[in-house]
């Protein structure tokens, strides 16, 4: 009798079986990345070094290629590309048509951690494809070239168990002439799509980004993906926090400030649990728009906004869409959310406002915000 379990499904079952054994990420992901027994530790001073180290980890001592990787891997990145970042910042509208730069982690399931050394910086993306158990921490990534070639800062495709933690991602929330919607600037900060699931995005500082990120590639990419966004700071961003198509998104203890178009856009029957966040100076921070149907639903709890009367206090405004849409302009829950399968201890929304900047982003020694710091 033929097996009814596909390779992808088998990978997800493996992820479930390891759920209680790996590191606690505060979200759906449970992984130690490459930081496990038998790991090989390397230092990379450039993008190409990272590429070479990963490729070398795909073959054994005899030079034979090993499916999924020959050994778990921890890479410390020490490079500094501030000169490229500064040049791009001085020529924002010239970046779109350049060649995209990035490290592709493809078909690697043995476990991989990339951690940026303090003071390092990158003008390249990290693209995770058909891989699992990937951790990226303390990377400062900005002003990437190659928007026309899908030059995302992070792209996660068909990859379960990925954790992006304590990174800084930045560009310019700016429109350049050249297309119908003036979209010739930069690509996304974090796109999660095409079968990617059990992903945790935590303690990142994301600023000056027009298109922050996707959860789902298209209206047909509505897999039952599970993603947690917690303790992130979003500042001066346009939209897609995320743009969610189907699946489940748990967003807690995030700081959203300076949203210029729309925030969490829950589409294609997606479900979102939005709790203990701080919203301010934001346009349509929770919405379901662009499709005209199949509206997503949300549960709102513990946020600094509790009722419509709070909108003026925190400078929250709402805009319509050309198609039928739903805004959270009554600030009420519109659905239910599945039981969260992991333990977490959110701090108050006020503590997020007061303290999160001391913890999110790079150079913070990967510290986390506990309730004891809120006093």
From Swiss-Prot:
Disulfide bonds join 93-176, 351-374. The keyword Kinase does not apply. Binds 1 Ca(2+) ion per subunit. It is found in: Secreted. One of its GO terms (cellular component) is extracellular region. Pathway: Glycan metabolism; pectin degradation; 2-dehydro-3-deoxy-D-gluconate from pectin: step 2/5. The keyword Transmembrane helix does not apply. GO terms for biological process: pectin catabolic process. The active site is at residue 240. Its cofactor is Ca(2+). GO terms for molecular function: metal ion binding; pectate lyase activity. Involved in maceration and soft-rotting of plant tissue. Belongs to the polysaccharide lyase 1 family. PLADES subfamily. This is Pectate lyase B. It comes from Dickeya chrysanthemi (Pectobacterium chrysanthemi). The lineage of its organism: Bacteria, Pseudomonadati, Pseudomonadota, Gammaproteobacteria, Enterobacterales.
């Amino acid at each position: 009798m033929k097996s009814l379990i596909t390779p992808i499904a088998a990978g997800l079952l493996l992820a479930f079986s390891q759920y209680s054994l790996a590191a606690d990420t505060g979200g759906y992901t449970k992984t130690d990345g490459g930081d496990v027994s038998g790991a090989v530790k390397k230092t990379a001073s450039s993008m190409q070094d990272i590429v070479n180290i990963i490729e070398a980890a795909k073959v054994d001592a005899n030079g034979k290629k090993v499916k999924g990787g020959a050994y778990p891997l921890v890479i410390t990145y020490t490079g500094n590309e501030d000169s490229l970042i500064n040049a791009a910042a001085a020529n924002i509208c010239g970046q779109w048509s350049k060649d995209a730069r990035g490290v592709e982690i493809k078909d690697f399931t043995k476990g991989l951690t990339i951690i940026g050394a303090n003071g390092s910086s990158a003008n390249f993306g990290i693209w995770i494809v058909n891989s699992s158990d990937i951790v990226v921490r303390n990377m400062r990534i900005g002003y990437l070239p190659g928007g026309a070639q899908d030059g995302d800062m992070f792209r996660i495709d068909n990859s379960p168990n990925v954790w992006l933690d304590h990174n800084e991602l930045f560009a310019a929330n700016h429109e350049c002439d050249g297309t119908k919607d003036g979209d010739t600037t930069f690509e996304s900060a974090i796109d999660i799509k095409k079968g990617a699931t059990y992903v945790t995005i935590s303690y990142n500082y994301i600023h000056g980004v027009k298109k922050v990120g996707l959860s789902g590639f298209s209206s047909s990419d509505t897999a039952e993906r599970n993603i947690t966004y917690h303790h992130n700071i979003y500042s001066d961003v346009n939209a897609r926090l995320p743009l969610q198509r189907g699946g489940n998104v748990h967003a807690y203890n995030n700081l959203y400030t300076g949203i210029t178009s729309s925030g969490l856009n829950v589409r294609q029957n997606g479900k979102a649990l939005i709790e203990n966040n701080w919203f301010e100076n934001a346009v349509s921070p929770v919405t379901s728009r662009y499709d005209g149907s199949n509206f997503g639903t949300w549960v709102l709890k513990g946020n600094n906004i509790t009722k419509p009367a709070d909108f003026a206090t925190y400078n929250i405004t709402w805009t319509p869409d050309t198609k039928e849409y739903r805004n959270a302009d009554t600030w009420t829950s519109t659905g239910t959310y599945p039981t969260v399968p992991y333990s977490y201890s959110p701090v108050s929304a006020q503590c997020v406002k007061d303290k999160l900047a001391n913890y999110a982003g790079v150079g913070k020694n990967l510290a986390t915000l506990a309730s004891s710091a809120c006093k």
